[in-house]
Amino acid sequence: MSSMTDDKLESNYKGNALLHLLSYMKPYAGWVTLCLVLVLALTGFDLYRPTLIGDAIDNFETQGDYNVIINTAWKYGIVLVVSFIFNMAQTWILQKTGQKIILTVRRELYIHIQSLSSRFFDLTPVGKLVTRVTNDVEALNEMYSGILVRLFRNIVKIIGLAVVMIALDRGLALVSFVLLPIVMVLTVVFRIISRKTYRIVRTKLTDINTFLSENISGMRVIQIFGREERKFEEFKDKDYRLYRAHYREMMVFAIFRPLIYILSVLSLMIVLGIGSNEVLDGAISIGTLYIFSQYIQQFFDPIQELAEQFSTLQSSIASAEKIFTILAEEPQVKEDENPIVLPKVLGRIEFDHVWFAYDGEHYVLRDVSFVIEPGEKVAFVGATGAGKSSILNLIGRYYDIQKGHIYIDGVDIRKLSKKLLRSAIGQMQQDVFIFEGDIESNIRLHDDIQFEDVRAAAEYVNASHFIEKLPQKYKEPVTERGATFSAGERQLLSFARTLAHKPAILVMDEATANIDTETEILIQEALEKLMKGRTTIMVAHRLSTIQHADCIMVMHKGKIRERGTHQELLAQNGIYKKLYELQIHHVISS
């Protein structure tokens, strides 16, 4: 089963990422408008300051009055103070608005990921999803917190400077713009190269996050097989590739910025050279030349910033495309428009000529039909890959079938509310997932379950035997995946979690497979009581654990080949008997 690549993810998104990003700003349109007004004012102040000093130079030259300098200083100071206040207000608005939008995007993405079907998670590495929710969402922060507004400010500033310079002296303005075509070419080249380098950085970062997520989770296996050095070499290779990608990105900026600076200095030198002659000829004043010199410096700065900001904007759009691709991903298992909500689930299960393939092509279940009445205990046995666990996945509708029907209490599960269906099924797996928190929260799973019910469930499955011995009992902290508990203790917590939610149907995928003999003895009695009055479906490899089932179904290559009680199947002298004799022989040999 191949994983879903970044290219595949991006190809699924067909919308306009920038327009989609801008749509998140609609709820804050008032604040954004105020921010743009402040930007226009700040741009006006930037244009006014050189004019203020230039006029002061000309007035002092003609009048020789020091009051001109004093008045100019006061005006300049007031402009600086007002600019500071406006800039502070603009920054506060941008940061607050940007963080709220990022909060919205991150929550929307997480909620959507929760709604996706199991098939999506089968194909998508966890590390990539973590990167989307963290790094890629954070990449949008700079865009919302400044890039868009600074882009607007720099564009307005460039236009304003060009208009004012032409108004002051058209000839000198044209001289100032002589190097502009070269700057524009460099800017376009920079944008193209920087976008490519950024995409490479993001890809390498995703690769290393995926590697870390997988290998840290599987560190025990790495240590058991002594693969630390090999894995470190793989990590070094991926880390070096990320370093090289960052280095190339840095070099692009390191070359572009000095080039723009050199061109701005050359332009200034040309203007000062020509402008000085015009001053000597009396064509323009010294103040006008000063204004031009300041405007040229201001003119090239926003051009450089525009190129870098466009690059950052493109980077944000690249991250947004990945995010919106996930948001555009449709759950394969969809809720019915008018789902049926049963007042009470009795637990009757029927498979009617069911065909199922995880990839839609290679069937793992072929024409499977059976009926389980409420309260019956049914076990599925067979070799690995026979389709036993697939049946469990289909009962909870984690996947949809290609052909046939599955009914719960006579209702097609595709018509039932997914929440109601899954809440009626208590699924106990071999690989128990324990969340960080405490024991009580892991049993309750933050549902509306009273502590008395939590404790009663733990006592019922004998989990209280080890919980009561802990220093903080039910408030005992639990580390990630419950690493401080034994496999048997984690299974007991899983049993208690299932019981606390009072399901009508029990599904056990070799639920006692990883439990030691002593712990298994403790829970067998609890399981017998637990299964009374509940439809129970068991998948077992150890046939000794299911001999008392009401019905045993033997699966082989996706089909039910035999069915009956333990004794009936032995009498058939078929697949089940062979499996049973093999296990008996193995036990005797051991």
Tell what function each PLM region has.
Residues A41-F45, R49, G77, V81-I93, ...:
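Hydrophobic alpha-helical membrane-associated segments
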